Amino acid sequence: GNGLVLPGASDEVTITVDPSRYGYLSVASMFVNTNDAFVGETGLSLKSLAVGESYQMSMNVWDSGTELNDELAATIPGPAGGGEGFNAARNDNNDVVAFHAGVISQDDGLANSALSANHRFLNPGAKVTITRVE
């Protein structure tokens, strides 16, 4: 993509593929103001799309389980926190990928949270549109 995508904004990426040779697409993106939330989908078929046709899907937000969701600035690598993100020395991981429950912000009563109400999200948390242009 073209960098940071703010809440409610969008980005557009054009790729060239030969659908008879490479008929599937995988996409992934991290929610930057979290320590380990992401969206991702693998194996999206491009083979049946006709020129001008689009496919759209809503994507759920996943928690990668690499660390505790404490919303502290020290653990959030995005602009809201500036922290280090993952650190193997910490022992707060659970190694299980699961649906993300969302974040708790200062506005929700977590006084030491690096996040505010504009960082909240619900599932689904992203939308992907694939359009065949030629």
Whereabouts are the PLM-identified features?
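Structured domain cores in non-transmembrane regions
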Residues: 1-50
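Extracellular low-complexity, O-glycosylation-prone Ser/Thr/Pro/Gly-rich "stalks"
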Residues: 1-2, 35-37, 41-43, 49-134
